[in-house]
Structure formats: structure tokens, C-alpha cells
UniProtKB/Swiss-Prot annotation:
This is Kinesin-like protein KIN-12F. Pfam families: Kinesin (PF00225). Belongs to the TRAFAC class myosin-kinesin ATPase superfamily. Kinesin family. KIN-12 subfamily. It comes from Arabidopsis thaliana (Mouse-ear cress). PANTHER family: KINESIN-LIKE PROTEIN, KINESIN-LIKE PROTEIN KIN-12D. The gene is KIN12F. GO terms for cellular component: microtubule. Residues 1-84, 1092-1114 are annotated as: Disordered. Residues 104-436 form the Kinesin motor domain. PROSITE patterns: KINESIN_MOTOR_2. InterPro entries: KIF15/KIN-12, Kinesin_motor_dom, Kinesin_motor_dom_sf, P-loop_NTPase. ATP binds at G175, Q176, N177, G178, S179, G180, K181, T182. Residues 10-39, 48-80 have a biased composition (Polar residues).
Amino acid sequence: MADNRIAGSLPTSSKWSFLPKSVSSHFKPSSNPRSSNPDIENAPPQNPNIHNPRNQSVSSKSTAYKNQMDSPNCRSQVSASRPRAISALKTRNEVEEEGASNPHVKVVVRIKPTKEYCWKVKKVSKVSYSVRDRHFTFDSVLDSNLNQDDVFQQIGVPLVRDALSGYNTSVLSYGQNGSGKTYTMWGPAGSMLEDPSPKGEQGLAPRIFQMLFSEIQREKIKSGGKEVNYQCRCSFLEIYNGQISDLIDQTQRNLKIKDDAKNGIYVENLTEEYVDSYEDVAQILMKGLSSRKVGATSTSFQSSRSHVILSFIVESWNKGASSRCFNTTRTSRINLVDLAGAGTNERDATKHCVEEEKFLKKSLSELGHVVNSLAENVHPGISDRSLHKTSCLTHLLQESLGGNSKLTILCNIFPSDKDTKRTMSTLRFGERAKAMGNKPMINEISEEDVNDLSDQIRLLKEELSKVKADACHSVGSKNDYFGAKNARESLNQLRVSLNRSLMLPKIDNDEEEITVDEDDFKELHLQIKSLRGSFNQKLKKFPVNRDSVNSSFVTAFGESELMDDDEICSEEVEVEENDFGESLEEHDSAATVCKSSEKSRIEEFVSENSISISPCRQSLILQEPIQSESPKFRDSLRKSIALSSSCLRNQNSLAKSIKSTCFAESQHIRSSLRGSKIFTGSTESLAASLRRGLDIIDNPMNPASNRCSVSLSSDNLTMQPPTDDRLPLSPLCPTCRICSSKLPSVVEGDGYHMEGVLEKQQELEKLCSEQAAKIEQLTRLVGQHKLQTEDETEKLMGASNGERLPSANENQLLSCITETYDVKQISDDDSKKTDFDIGEKEALLKEIEDLKKKLQTPVTMSTNELRSSLLARSFQLRSKNAEKDIEEERLRCTEMESEWISLTDEFRVEIETQRTRAEKAEAQLKQEKLSSEELEDALRRAVLGHARFVEHYTELQEKYNDLCSKHKATVEWITELKKAVAKAGKKGCGSRFAKSLASELSALRVERERERDLLKKENISLKIQLRNTAEAVHTAGEVLVRLREAEQSASAAEEKFNEVEEENEKLKKKMEKLKRRHKLEVVTIKKSLKQNTLPESALQPLHQRNSAIEEEGM
């Protein structure tokens, strides 16, 4: 099959088209394949058993070396170190048991046979060897007598075993030029398409991939009830002069190395081909090796001048028969590294060759530096990332050198006296690399890990969408998401996905032949009779109910499952509203009891090797789940927070309303879930998540309702808990509220203050009546005083001595004046205490002044002194009282100011507390919004998961219906067969029936072959169409990427053009300024010339001289 496929897909004429002329001329098959030039690096080594006349000069030395290697001790050592061919891989437990003996870094030395005399390699101990009186530690040494199959058994078989176990593996071929590195790794180009044989010349890589694919097929066959899927992809790159090139797609050159947390270290835009057989890998190897850079050196005229790395990734998925998704996923990487040796070409010393040799020596020296630093590291397995980034080779081999990989270093040496220095450096490199500490791990992801990482993936997807949205909105930025760089990356991903879509399953071309004989027919007849007898016996033991549905499916593990819808649906459990989880558990337990009872009965029935066939009816059609609304907070709950007493008063009722609405919505959700709870066993996780969500919805309402609210009363500025019977305050500012609180007239409904006001009014009325009586007395006294003063004036005029004595009337007048002043003072004091109008006070003062005037008019000159003394006393009293009033007013103002300051401070503190409370409320509101969004997301995902469950069950229902129809068809066919057999038995023509049955089967086989051929043709045409569409999509993507690049170049050119235009405008402005300056200078010069006093005759010679100079210049 494999040969036919290769011959059909790749003809012999085109096999050599991948190779250059210089290489293909040497590697084409000939009559004597051993007669190739031994100076070529990829040529097979010379067999010492074949006679060669060129070796006669050194025959004695070579025979001595041959005799030493053919000694029984050496033969026993070689046979002991050579493992036998492994027919099947060991299990994972055996691999772990051998982990102690299997080192993570293995060093193997292979010796290339030489024509000249070579020095000896002595084995000192199990892992120690002596070369020219120096001891080295290696895992094994392969001498020149061992062939390619021995190298594969030593290196390749453990590598394939580790790769299929989930480990990363690497093989690094190191050595000088002409030591056989390329031959050991790849073998001759013509041997890749040969059949594998122990004595063949196939290299290590082809043998590894042949065994790998054969073991994959064997694992698929041995999987039993498990479903095992494998997917392999391959990439091939070259490092030449410090630049990375793609050997599969040669248009991809100068590629960059990227390092991120998701993909690790990878090469950008590197082609990865999906392969499913060894032939695909062989084509990639032939194409890549034909494009590798080769050149002539001092040791061989065709030597590798570049490093090549072949990366092969194996992904496997294991899925059990009972599980719905994959249980484990393994990913392993195989890196095959072929390094170029540092050799000079003495004949050709051009600049290109010198630069080539410089880069090779630099990369190898950087590799040696990394190996030395890792070997001397105190903590093995821990490597500095900056250490590996010194060159492309060490950067790509970061995981292989001191990382998560099992490394095998193949040191190829050429033991001759000419290259002793390079041989010893190769051995020292292998010994240092042996001391590196790699930490390989099994790259396996289980189902539990996937469940744990699902939330992280969801969050990362949200962040990615946000980043993409931000990148799309940022127009004109350099890091645009739709730039040419990102477009190129998306094109590469599209190409990978197209290659993956082309991976169609293979068609099994094995032809099935059905041969029918009379003996087979007799055996079938006996089996039918035995089954009929056992069926009748079981019918007697177990009566079958025709109405119920009893359909059993026997799986690959021998387990039986029963779907009894009538019995499961008949058991209904009453679900209480307050205990949703217990109802689910009760329903689940009831369903499991029914299933277990029916399962035990069926297992007893099946255990006795009998089959019961009963007519099946279709089960009920699965209904879709009822759409349940997610618990959202209404818009009228708390959109904003107002710092008022009314909002604080209504907070309890608001919390109650929130709680009632959430309770109603939770009841609605429960009822919807109760109605959609069809498959209880599969919805346990959904019920648990919804139960937690309902608890979260119900619980946050309690702290919101228990918050204590605070109100500001007008009586005293203290924080008091609110009461339900408080009156709403008027919408006034705090200052107006305080002023209104001080006025007793504003206070309503306070009896104590009203009584005080009435008492004060009565007192004021009494004072007014007393003052009115005093005023009347004063008027009477004034009248009497007038009469007395007239009499006294007459008496005084008649007196001669001019002295007078104060009379009783004068004393009485003085007492009246003082009494009026006291009444005035009392009235003033009362006016301060009372709320008299200003008009009444002025009227009283006017009356007092009128009285004073009336008193002053009748007073004569003799009473001037008395009046002046009385007035002075009154003025003194008034000044003292005024000063006291001013001081009292000042004290009162200061007290009021202090009260206002204290009130403002208290109000400021109150505002700050209310502000902090509002901020806390806003934060809590945001948290509640976030929790509500998370709950909505959880419910949405739960509903989607439930819908997927329903879809899955509908698919199962359709499959079940198909199986029922097939079962009915088989039952009908068996009944017809039974009838035919009975008729043939009665007539005695069994042989004729057998012949007719054979003819029917042959006719069916012919029809099946025709259908198969048609399907093959359709499959081929579909593959061709798929490839054509893939090529068309790829070309369209390439066109789009180039258009994007052209747009970017055009935009860059436009920007440059705009910049040039701006510069031109600036230059034009500068020219205009210079012209203006020049005109001004010319005008000034002309003015200065006009103002010059020299005559014109003196200026004419100068003018003539200038004109002559201008003519000569012309």
C-alpha cells in the first residue's frame, strides 16, 4: 500500500527533481551503491570487510585495529550495548520505572571509520572511556563496525517511546566537518523511500518517523473502547549567516523569533505542514535537504554550511467510551538538530566564504558558552533567558538546553592524527553537556485542568476583545490592529487552518470478502434454534409488558443502559419553593433508584447469554427548556442617592420592595427550572450553580435593609435614629431652618411657647396702662407747676437780696423729672424684652420731648442753673446706659457669631459624613451591579449549557430512532430468514437455499463495491475542489495583504508628500520675506544715492566701469 501510494503521488523522475544537479548526480541509484566518493560528508562509511586497493599502504595498521575491534571482549561489549528491536512500546508505568536509569541528557559518541591509522578508544568502566590517555564520561560509544540500525536502536527507539509518553525530546548532531553528522542523521537522499531494513542506509530521522507512525497505528488498534486521535505537524528551518529561512516554503526568508506566554518560543510565519504518514514526512525531508546550503571545505568538497532544525509535534487526545469529552490531551515535540562544522576552504578565500565561516564559528562558540554556563550552574534546570538570546541557534534550543526536554547529543568524531584538536574539542563538548540538568515533564492536560482553566480562558477572551476594540478605535496609530504586520500574521494563521481542513480521514481500501458455506449455514441455523429456545424460557420467567419501552444498548465495555421514560416520568416529586436543592436531590435519587433496579434486572437477563427482542416504540420528543429570565435589578431601585430625610425615611420600605421583587423573580426562576427539569442526572452541576446564584441574590438584601439611617432634627444638632411618624421638613437651606427654629411664631403645635407669649403680652399691656396713668399725673403736675411758677416769679421779683430757697414745688418737680426718666428707662428695658413696634417707641419719645418743652417754657432765668444740673445728670445717666447697651450688643454679637461658627462647623461635619455615606452607597451599588452582571453571565452560560444538553439529547434521540429502525429491519430480515429456513427444511433443499443466499450476498457485495467506487470518485473530486478553494482563499489573502501593504506605503508616501509641500511653503514664505527685504534695501540705497552731494560727472566713470564689467560677464 505504501509503495503504491508513493509511486502514485511522487514518480521516480520527480524524486530527484528536488535535489540539485551536483547532489543528484552522486546519489542516484547505480549498480554498485558502495562505490560512492568517501570524501562527501553524507556518503556512507567504508566497510572494512570489502577489499580496496587504495588501502594497501595502511593494511597492517587497519588490520590491527580491525582485530582489536573483532576481539570477543569488544564483541560482547557491543552486543551488550545494542538493544534489540522493539515490536511494541512499553506502557507508561514501565517508562516511569526506567526513569531512574534513563538520564535526561544522554551523550553518545560515534566513530567514523577511516583509511588511515587511528588512535584507540578504550573502555575503562561502564560509562568511562579513555582517549589518548584522557578519560571522558559518556553513555555509550558506537564504533565503526556498527551500522545505521544500531544507532537507531540506541537513540531512536527510546526517543519514540518518550515522545508517545508525552515528553519533549531532542537529538543534537555535533562534530567536525566530514565526521558523518548528516549521514547519521538523515542518510543518503535515495534511501528515504526505501523499505526499512536492519542493513539499510536510512538515517536516524527516517527510521524514527517510520516507527512513530507504525506505533500510532498500533495504539489506535489496541485502544479497545477508547477513542484515540493523533495529529502531527512538521516544520523545517535553516540558520545561515545568522538568518532563519523556511525550507518548506523557500519564499519565507529572514524570519524573526517571537516569545510569548501562550505559544512560547516560535518562529514567526514559519510553515507547519500537517502530516498523517511517513511518506509526507519523507517528501518534506527531501525537499528541505535539497535546499540546504552546502560548500567545499578542506575535509570534503560537499559539506553542510548551515544549521537545520526539524520540529515534529505530536498531539494526542484520549476519550473514554462513557465520557462525552476528551479525558487527557498530550503534546510532545521532537527536535532533530543537524549542526554544521566549522571548517575552512584553503582554496577559496573569498569574502562570502570568510563571512560564512565567521558566522559558523560564532554560533558554535555561543552554543559552547551556553553549555558551559548550564553545566556549571548550581541549580540545574534553571536557565537565564538572556543567556540563550545571544544567537538564533541557542534561542531556538532554549527548551532543549536546560529546559523541559530529554536531550541526546550525538558526537561524531573522525579519529585521525590530522584533526586531533577538533576531535578532542568535540569530546570535551560532549562531556560538558553531560553535566547539564534538564527538567523534562509530561505535557499532559486532563479534564480537571480544562475545567479549572475555563474561567481564565473566558477572562482572557474578554481582555482580548477589549484590546482589539481599543486597537480598532485608535485610527492613525502605528500599532494599528489592521496593519500589514498583523495582516501577515492572520494570513499565516489562515494558511495553517486551511492545511488543517485538508486533513480528511483516509478511506479503508481493504476489500472484505464474504464466503458462505453449508457448514456456516448449519451453525447459523443451530444458533437461531438455541436462541429461540432460550428466549421462550426467559419469556416464561419474566413476563414482558408490551406497553412499556425496554430498550438496552450494550456498549464496548459490556455495560447496559436503559431508557425507561414512563417509569422515570411517573415518579413526580413535589418541589417546595423554599427548598430547591432538596427537591433536586430527591428527584435524582428517585431516578437513580429506578435506573439501578432496571439495570440489575437487565444484567441478570443478559448474563445468561440470551437476547430478547421486543417491538420498540419511539420515546417522547424532548422539549426545549423554558427561557428563564435572569435576576436583574430594576431601574427604580437605587439609581441615585439624595441626601434628604425623606429618602432616608423610605429606605426600609425600599429594601422591602427590593426583597419582594427579588423573591418574586427567584420564584419565577425556580418555577421555570422546575418546568425544564427533564434530565435530572445530567443537570446536577447546573442546579448547584443556580442554587448558589439564588442564595447570592437573596442574601445581599439583608445588609441593605439593616442599614441605620440618620436624620437632622431642628431642636438639637445630634444624630438620631429615624422614626416612622416624623414630619417631612420644608425644602429650606440649613441657615434658614435654624433662623426659623429660633422664632417661636414658626413653631407649630407647641403649647408651652404659646403660653409664654400670652404672658408677655399681658405684662406689656399692664406696663402700658401704668405709663398712661403716670403721663396723666405728669400733665396735672405740669398744670399745677405753671400756677406755682407764676406766683413764685412775682415773689422773687419783689425780693431784694436776690437769694432764693428751694421750695417744695421745685422738689416735687425734680422728683417728677427723675420719675419720668425712670419710667423712660423702664420702658426702654421693657422694649428690649418685648416686641413693641418702633412707631410706638418714637411716639413716647415725642411725648417726653413735648413735656420737656412745656417744662422749659415757663421756667425763668432763675431756674436755669437747676435745669442745667438736671440735664447734666440726665445726660450722664444716658451715656452710662448707652455704653452698657453697646457692650451688651457687642457681647450678644460675639455670642451669635460663635454660635453661627459652631453651627457652620457642625453642618460641615454633617455634610462630610453624608458625603462619605453617599460614596459608600455608590461603591456598594457598583458592587451590586457587578454581582448582578456576573449572575446574569452565569445564568446565561447555564442556559446555553442546558440548551447544548438538550441538543445533545436530541441527537441521541435521532440516533436511537435510527437504531430502532435498523433493529426493526434486522428483525424482519431474521423472520424472513427463519421462514425461508423452515421452508427449505421441509422441502429438503438446504443446499439450494445456501447457494441462493450466497448469490444474494455476492450481489450485495458487488453493489457495495460500486457504491464504494462512486464514493471514492466523489471523495477525490471533493479533495480537488477543496484544494482549489484553499489555494483560491490563500491567493485572495495574499492579495489582501499586499493591498494592505500598498495602502500603508501609499499613506506613507502621502505623508512624505505633505511634509515636502509644507517645507516648500515655508521656503516660499522665506523667499517672499527676502524679496521684501531686498526691495527695502534697494529703496534705501536709492535714497542714500539721491542724498549724496557728489556731482554727476564724478559718478559717470564709476557707472561706465560697472557697465563694462557687466558686458564682459555677458
